[in-house]
Amino acid sequence: MYVIIKFDNKGGDAMCTYILMHKNIPVLTAILDDTLTVTKVTEIINPDHKPLNMMVMDNQEIALNDFLRYHAIPSSRSNLEDLLEAYHASDALEFSLRSYQLNLSDHYWMKPIHSNLDWDTINSYDHPIIDTPLFLSDSDDIDIDLITPNSSVNGSLRQMWVQHKKGIRLLKAGNFLNQQPFNEVFVSKLCKELNFHHVPYELETITSGKIVSSCPLFTSGDIEYIPAWHIAAPLKRRDNKYQAFLDQCTHFSIPNVKAHLDATLALDYLTLNDDCHYGNFGFLRNSTTLEFLGMAPIFDNGNTLWYNEMTINPHRPFHTYPSLPFKSKHDKQIKYVTTPLTIPQSLSKTAMELMDFIYAKNSNITEDRLTMMKTSFAERLDMLNAYLTKLK
């Protein structure tokens, strides 16, 4: 059962002093001012458990601020203002800190200095998630005293963790065409055909009638997700950010990175993913032993396949489509891929069948649009095949 403590950042220094916890391990203490900005990291208690970005940045206050703000809902979330108004929070960071920045990605949380809370009492892995639908859709069903991991979910689209019979799942909506949820499902099916390590996605209809994507949790009470941005800060000074990233992974003894990363870049090339930033891929780590297990499964592929184009331009050159994170265009980024990936001969036929089956469920996807998507995707698949053939 959750212990509810009212959030108050107006009680002087003591109320603004927090312990950054890693499960039940105190990591450091820090003072936050009335804007919830870290002004001083006062003590490093367990340096081995510091967030990884604090190990690659010299300024510990800036690094910790980055870490805390990453766990808050971004300003680009379309319903953020509605959430802040409903929960009487001044900004996203305050909203996140009310639930101690508990989340379902990593095992860090912020504990008020005089609190007797512990991980076993409040973590979201061992206790039911009870929350308002407002995170996902319009709703008047709100309990502002709930401790929720949903106030610490990074991402621009409306989304929330829910407790299902199948376990904990992330539900995520789309934008004006609502194409992203369908893209998530299609791309995860592609990954299965390609034998890429990935998170499986399904479509789900919520109470409002809206169709969203649904995927299982890929962390656990023992395994946490560390996004790639934690080690990306030094990469900005390097011409070859791809190799610099691999070097950083070697430095931190993260295994089996290149093959998985190459598969991710090939998939992004194929699907024209413009959203593979350093938060959308990363690593799995045992939070007790601090051992890295490898790359996290491929996830978050909604911003693909012309998701943001009301009308697809068949004459737009493929080399103009943007990419992340190592190069600004896919045609340049794909050149980093040297792993001999194999594409099944049957994939073209299978992909066409999957597109017919999946996108037919979206009333915004007209027959003409689907035909254009299939034609362009088939062309893109031929281009990827041609590139990979040269590697053999």
Predicted regions and their residues:
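Phosphate/dinucleotide-binding and metal-coordinating scaffold of catalytic cores
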Residues: Y2-A266, L270-L272, L284-K392
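Catalytic-loop of the protein kinase fold
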Residues: N273, Y278
